[in-house]
Amino acid sequence: MELNIKMDRSKELFEESKKYLVGGVNSPVRLFKPFPFFVKSAKDCFLYDEDGNEFIDYCLAYGPMVLGHANENILNAVKSQMDLGTAYGVPSEKEITLAKEVINRIPCAEMVRFVNSGTEATMGAIRLARGVTKRNKIIKFEGAFHGAHDYVLVKTGSGALTHGAPNSPGIPEDTTKNTLLIPFNDEEAVRKVISENKEEIACIILEPVMGNVGCIPPKDGYLQFLREITEENGILLIFDEVITGFRLSKGGAQEYYGIKSDLATVGKILGGGFPIGAITGKKEYMEQFSPNGQIYQAGTFNGNPISVTAGIETLKNLDDKFYKETTKKAGILSNCLRETAEKYNIPAKVYNVASIFQVYFNDKEIVTYEDAKSSDTEKFMKYFYTLLENGVFVAPSQFECCFTSIKHNDEVLEKTMNAIDIAMKKL
């Protein structure tokens, strides 16, 4: 596939990169044909590549950059912290400051354990649930992505689905035999699996909005149903809010939908562009982590002062005005996608929750993983390439979602809508 934009330098770098990095990339979802563009710099809602191209960015590093790239307040705070040290191996006051802010925002959060990624957070939360309940089985929803660890890397979304590996080799059957898979938004399937595994299920883990298979919202009442059935059966409810945390609202999906989980995992936005994750939840559960309890979790860079500093500065700026503006922008683009698809008679379904959105080239409603998989992925990639040629970058996969930031202004939205029109017309 030849793109009608200059990418000579990116092509050179990709050929060199393949000699040293597996597949030429450090995460599979970053790869697209014929080769990805290589970024030289980023500012606000723009990426600038090695060939001098400018792209309006709706990927936002897969979610974290809600305040835009190279935010001056975050950069200044981090630069000041760097003069004080970049890793300590002992506690610092800023860890307390950020933990307090997380607890003030997330409804279920009574205590926090900082880690280094969303993957570490979900792995730790599942271990905690198993330790607390003394049960081994977990329920996971088909197509949900909860990180790249063995407990959950089965029938998963995100890059694994994009590149045809939803069930990764290298994971022993004994590891996943305790992972029970259920279609999202299906109440009867949940009831059936719980009834067949009485007093064996430690937790249900889910993305409240499935953001790693596009954007699939929960059906009305579905999260409340999960809350009730888990309480009735002594099962912990874990919200994986690595994507939705601090994006849907100050308190993430829990505040947005009015449902309080037992545990929640966050990341991405929490680090303001630096690596971080966190496990949060009720004190009675969280205190089972060592050193207070017997459930072990540790990490050299847990509570890293650079990441924590960036997180404090980020959350300071996420107020009601921020959520109102970013939600409005995503709504404008979602409406544009619907109207433009209809204008050109293209079967499409568009889903939007707060500042998250995605289009599926499909004529049926998308409520499960199987529905998402039935979408026309070839058409999506044609749409992706045309957007790219017209200066707009979205994630190169049907099974990721788009995000708006505070830096996507009216002029940027207008350019984006023009690009959407061109892309839809070509389809």
Swiss-Prot record:
Give the Gene3D superfamilies listed for this entry: Aspartate Aminotransferase, domain 1 (3.90.1150.10), Type I PLP-dependent aspartate aminotransferase-like (Major domain) (3.40.640.10)
Q: Which Pfam families match?
A: Aminotran_3 (PF00202)
Fetch the CDD domains from UniProt.
Answer: OAT_like
Q: Name one GO biological process term.
A: protoporphyrinogen IX biosynthetic process
Q: Does the keyword Secreted apply?
A: no
The entry's localization annotation reads: Cytoplasm
Please name the pathway. Answer: Porphyrin-containing compound metabolism; protoporphyrin-IX biosynthesis; 5-aminolevulinate from L-glutamyl-tRNA(Glu): step 2/2
Q: SUPFAM superfamilies attached here? A: PLP-dependent transferases
Q: Which GO terms describe its molecular function?
A: glutamate-1-semialdehyde 2,1-aminomutase activity; pyridoxal phosphate binding; transaminase activity
Which segment of the chain is annotated as a signal peptide? none
Q: What is its main location?
A: cytoplasm
Please provide one cellular component term from the Gene Ontology annotations of this protein.
cytoplasm
Q: Which reaction does it catalyse?
A: (S)-4-amino-5-oxopentanoate = 5-aminolevulinate
Q: Which residues carry this modification: N6-(pyridoxal phosphate)lysine?
A: K268
- Give the cofactors, semicolon-separated: pyridoxal 5'-phosphate
What family is it from? Belongs to the class-III pyridoxal-phosphate-dependent aminotransferase family. HemL subfamily.
Tell me which NCBIfam families the record gives.
Answer: hemL (TIGR00713), PRK00062.1 (NF000818)
HAMAP family linked to this entry:
HemL_aminotrans_3 (MF_00375)
Name it.
Answer: Glutamate-1-semialdehyde 2,1-aminomutase
What is the species listed in this Swiss-Prot or TrEMBL entry? Methanococcus maripaludis (strain DSM 14266 / JCM 13030 / NBRC 101832 / S2 / LL)
